[in-house]
Amino acid sequence: MPVMAPTASLLLSPRPLPASRRVPSLPALSASGRLRLRRARADTRLRVAAPPSVPGEADQAPGETEPSTSSADEKFVWRDHWYPVSLVEDLDPSVPTPFQLLNRDLVIWKDPKSGEWVALDDRCPHRLAPLSEGRIDETGCLQCSYHGWSFDGSGACTRIPQAAPEGPEAKAVRSPKACAIKFPTLVSQGLLFVWPDENGWEKATATKPPMLPKEFEDPAFSTVTIQRDLYYGYDTLMENVSDPSHIEFAHHKVTGRRDRARPLPFKMESSGAWGYSGSNSGNPRISATFVAPCYALNKIEIDTKLPIFGDQKWVIWICSFNIPMAPGKTRSIVCSARNFFQFSMPGKAWWQLVPRWYEHWTSNLVYDGDMIVLQGQEKIFLSASKESSADINQQYTKITFTPTQADRFVLAFRAWLRKFGNSQPDWFGNPSQEVLPSTVLSKREMLDRYEQHTLKCSSCKGAYNAFQTLQKVFMGATVAFCATAGIPADVQFRLLLAAAALVSAAVAYAFYTLQKNFVFVDYVHAEID
């Protein structure tokens, strides 16, 4: 079986979660590999960033809790959970970062005074300009770029440049109306989590987010993480990651092969408002768990025999967070681990035999393999929903034909969304009239790696900029060699300069060609033999 890259395709679980425990919600891992992960996990305390006025922290050791069975009339409260918004290593602490969560605009920034990541409502209380367009000022506060109002890590206003130094205007800076709305945040395992209810500090402090399995700390496992913003809905992505059977076809010659398709007799083991779990038997064995609202775990165990090493048990973990940003827009954060085909080395990221950005090339191929298929599927679902004036989840089994056990997890997710999730996330605002991206974006826009991933990935953005610089360096060298090739009287020296010009031109072109992997790669299934 091929090496599994972090993908929005396949997800599996450590073991079926017992039906007597309630699952919490906690962040995922940092991406450069197990070394950084172990450092991130060294501090096992989960600390919630201080609330707007009174500091609060949850000093609880991270761990799993088991789900409880749920009655059919129990409803899932979307806003009472931790949501990961980014891998911490892909956030730039020197600038504010915009993010959407449940259709609410947030600004993420790092308070240099406390060292904490802060999430505020992305609107200045003055005239509602987006704070994400601002900057971190000289005092370490977030400054609005429109009129210069500044806010500290608690959301309190610290400066109004237009206010008179005395009198009523001087008091405005201390007014509650001048404060920005702050949300609970938590960092663990290299992920930044946000609690989307500004009034939920007490509940957030008492709630733990779901953990990655212990194998992510094991030196015997090699790990990779990636995040990418996808222009289709949360339900479309969750259906996709709940479906192992599509791997062999949608990701042919990437992480699967068409000739390996076979029956997948999955069986459900537990379900409720918390999510569900299930598995199959045989080789490979796939275990899957969905922990609502957005955490999916898949574990693949493969018994194999190698000529030199003998019997081996290969284990692959693919843990996915599928974050509902807005209707028709979802962030996928995937953490994968494997105990075979390891290419990581002790030391820093630049020292790795296979750098993170190169791993992301394969991972993005997986995303691309799903992208246009899911765009078309979502369009058809939306059309069917409009024709019948009924929600897709209410009529899913009527408009689809799912006769095999391979679709068990897909049906389980759709059933969960219908029974407990009110058929869609609890969006802020009134998004029903918004045009969904999948209905209007072109193929080129849907497969835009630069906007969806490179700009949001520290590794790929750095490599892309480096490739551009190296391309220019070798182009300059080509010009220099060409300009001087005719000067020497020695023919051999002229030939040497001409050869150097050809080599540098070829290297410059190679760097130019490689840059497409950070920007756009067309994906045509029919052209893959």
From Swiss-Prot:
Sites where the protein binds [2Fe-2S] cluster: C124, H126, C144, H147
Subcellular location: Plastid, Chloroplast
Keywords: 2Fe-2S, Chlorophyll catabolism, Chloroplast, Iron, Iron-sulfur, Metal-binding, Oxidoreductase, Plastid, Transit peptide
Top-level enzyme category: oxidoreductase
Tissue: Expressed in leaves. Expressed at low levels in roots, stems, panicles and seeds.
Main location (coarse class): plastid
Note accompanying the cofactor annotation: Binds 1 [2Fe-2S] cluster per subunit.
PROSITE patterns: RIESKE
GO cellular component: chloroplast; cytoplasm
Pfam families in the cross-refs: PaO (PF08417), Rieske (PF00355)
Region ranges (Disordered): 1-24, 46-72
Induction: Induced by wounding and senescence in leaves.
Annotated metabolic or biological route of this protein: Porphyrin-containing compound metabolism; chlorophyll degradation
GO process terms (BP): chlorophyll catabolic process; defense response to bacterium; flower development; fruit development
Known EC number: 1.14.15.17
Gene Ontology molecular functions: 2 iron, 2 sulfur cluster binding; chlorophyllide a oxygenase activity; metal ion binding; pheophorbide a oxygenase activity
Transit peptide: 1-47
Function of the protein: Catalyzes the key reaction of chlorophyll catabolism, porphyrin macrocycle cleavage of pheophorbide a (pheide a) to a primary fluorescent catabolite (pFCC). Works in a two-step reaction with red chlorophyll catabolite reductase (RCCR). Creates the intermediate RCC through the opening of the porphyrin macrocycle by the introduction of one atom of molecular oxygen at the alpha-methine bridge. Seems to be specific for pheide a. Belongs to the chlorophyll catabolic enzymes (CCEs). May play a role in senescence and response to wounding.
Name of this protein: Pheophorbide a oxygenase, chloroplastic
Species of provenance: Oryza sativa subsp. japonica
High-level lineage: Eukaryota, Viridiplantae, Streptophyta, Embryophyta, Tracheophyta
